[in-house]
Amino acid sequence: MRSSTVLYVLGAAILAVNGVTTALISDGVDKGSQEQTRWLRSNAMEHETDDEERVLEFKLPSSISTWRAERFERLESLEKQKEMERQAVLELVDKYAPLLLTDRMFAGFTKLDQEGIPLPSMIALLREHGKDITSEMEAYLINSYKTTHKIPLELNTAR
């Protein structure tokens, strides 16, 4: 081997050893960089207690948070309104089902007229909410209603 090659290899080896020892000895920790960060992370977690844990909070700009709050309130009020309407419909069904589906249907017709509820919509509500109304019963109710209110025969065929 030539002397220049030997010097070249020897210089490269010295530089490599110097770089490795500098990296391992920095900060008095004799570990690799990944192991060092792992050690620092675990060491930091040992010193924190449960009530000192840091929670990162992302705060929205006030305009966005106000918009979201208003939207939530609108949705909540719509849900309350729908629930109130549903309760009102169920009360109507419970009120008129015994009248219309028994022999007291003419009293039911009178009450429907007083409250301004059309008979076809009441029949649809009764059917929708689980009351057993056959098509014959529906036709009988409609015909009885039309004859009670003296609606002309031409309108009896139309629903």
Curated annotation (Swiss-Prot):
Classify the main location: secreted
Q: Does the keyword DNA-binding apply?
A: no
A GO cellular component annotation here is:
host cell cytoplasm
Instruction: Give the residue ranges of motif RxLR-dEER.
Output: 38-54
- Highest taxon listed in the record's lineage: Eukaryota
Signal peptide start-end: 1-19
Q: Which UniProt keywords apply?
A: Host cytoplasm, Host nucleus, Secreted, Signal, Virulence
Its annotated compartments are: Secreted; Host nucleus; Host cytoplasm
Describe the task this protein carries out: Secreted effector that completely suppresses the host cell death induced by cell death-inducing proteins.
**What's the family?**
Belongs to the RxLR effector family.
Q: What is known of its domains?
A: The RxLR-dEER motif acts to carry the protein into the host cell cytoplasm through binding to cell surface phosphatidylinositol-3-phosphate.
Q: What is this protein called?
A: Secreted RxLR effector protein 50
Its organism's taxonomic lineage begins at: Eukaryota, Sar, Stramenopiles, Oomycota, Peronosporales
Gene symbol here is RXLR50
